[in-house]
Amino acid sequence: MQRPENDIKGIAPRKLLIKRSGEKKMICKIRKWKLSDATDLAAALSNKKIQDNLRDGLPYPYTEQDGTEYISAMLSADENETFAFAITVDNKVIGSIGVFRQENIHRQTAELGYYIAEEYWGKGIMTEAVKQICEYVFAGSDIIRIYAEPFAYNTASCRVLEKAGFQYEGTLRSNAVKNGKVIDMKMYSLLK
């Protein structure tokens, strides 16, 4: 079976059993962004609950034009420094995931960031996407450590990382200011 040209080579899409009123198999995969994804991206990010778990700087509401600008930036980024992909379920874009190489003495370390649309929370999809991107980055680059720093109150994100094999390294006390509050963050990492 031939892969569509935007699929990530070497990463097999996996079927997840999603439990709703009935059981439905959904295919979760990461793929390169397309400019036509801007509408789905804007729909996912125009949600305050999602933005409350991300770093500051995103416009709210998030527009299709904002999505187009972000996707353009990701498509033009150095592919050895920025690994940024759309998360899809059954060919619909439902979120974003990226691994971003650090600099200087941390040049073989990269930070992981991600989110998915609220209606897909708690279904194992994000854990699967995290596994896929880590597999891809470790197989195709010299990166030896991928880390993530979720807000300490974001227990769902912490669970995603743990289920994806990341190890909890500690709490970064009073490490950020979000929505006017000083908050802790947690440090997780996965080694090659």
Question: How would you label these PLM feature ranges?
Answer:
Residues 1-39, 43-49, 84-192:
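Acyl-donor (CoA/ACP) binding surface of acyl/acetyltransferases
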